[in-house]
């Protein structure tokens, strides 16, 4: 089953619907990371849920609004290549692509059309990729409105699947408006620092 979050206005009208992160990820985001306040953690959690929901619903307009016009986007896909002359020996290889917002949205539109369904899930990550650690949320020391959010991503669709780690650099405007993503990167495995 999948949990969802529904928000209502004072008149009882639905103002927002999004798929909820699993309880373990939400708890990890609550207790971990160098985030200024509980309010900011809740806002980050809400936007991560909206981000995931937009992909699962193939809502290209919402995704496009979430990215800065000058966003740096690095995507990766796992390609299975034959190793040597042995027809039964295959080795996974990752192909990375650096894109701007227009290229990414165009490629994502095609991916949405190619797939009957998409199911993205985010989960926590720990030290060196181990389980039961904290999801990574860091606040920029130079710009207090910038937050890096790191999480494990499981991408499953009707014709492709992979697992890896996603990093999003969000800017939360001082005026309280919707945050925008300046950087989105993906890698197949955790690289510790």
Where are the predicted features?
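Surface-exposed, charged secondary-structure patches
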Residues: 1-7, 86-163
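Amphipathic, hydrophobic N-terminal targeting peptides for secretion and organelle import
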Residues: 1-17, 187, 192-193
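Short, solvent-exposed coil/turn segments at beta-strand boundaries
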Residues: 6-14, 142-144, 170-181
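Short, low-complexity N-terminal intrinsically disordered segments enriched in polar/charged residues
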Residues: 12-57, 61, 65
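Short, solvent-exposed aromatic-acidic interface loops
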Residues: 18-28, 152-157, 182-193
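Acidic/histidine-rich, surface-exposed loop or edge segments in extracytoplasmic proteins
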Residues: 29-32, 80-92
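Sec-exported extracytoplasmic/periplasmic mature domains
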Residues: 52-56, 68-72, 109-117
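Short, well-ordered alpha-helical segments enriched in acidic and aromatic residues
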Residues: 59-83
């Amino acid at each position: 089953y999948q949990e969802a979050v529904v928000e209502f206005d004072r008149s009882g009208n639905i103002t927002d619907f999004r798929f909820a992160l699993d309880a373990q990820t939400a708890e990890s985001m609550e207790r971990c990371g160098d985030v200024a306040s509980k309010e900011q953690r809740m806002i980050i959690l809400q936007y991560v849920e909206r981000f995931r929901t937009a992909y699962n619903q193939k809502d290209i307009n919402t995704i496009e609004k979430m990215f800065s016009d000058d966003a740096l986007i690095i995507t990766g896909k796992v390609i299975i290549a034959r190793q040597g002359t042995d027809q039964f020996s295959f080795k996974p290889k990752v192909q990375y692509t650096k894109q701007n917002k227009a290229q990414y949205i165009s490629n994502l539109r095609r991916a949405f059309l190619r797939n009957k369904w998409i199911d993205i899930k985010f989960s926590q990550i720990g030290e060196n990729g181990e389980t039961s650690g904290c999801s990574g949320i860091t606040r920029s020391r130079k710009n207090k409105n910038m937050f890096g959010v790191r999480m494990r991503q499981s991408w499953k669709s009707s014709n492709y699947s992979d697992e890896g780690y996603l990093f999003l650099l969000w800017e939360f405007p001082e005026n309280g408006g919707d945050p925008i993503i300046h950087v989105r990167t993906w890698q197949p495995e955790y690289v510790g620092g």
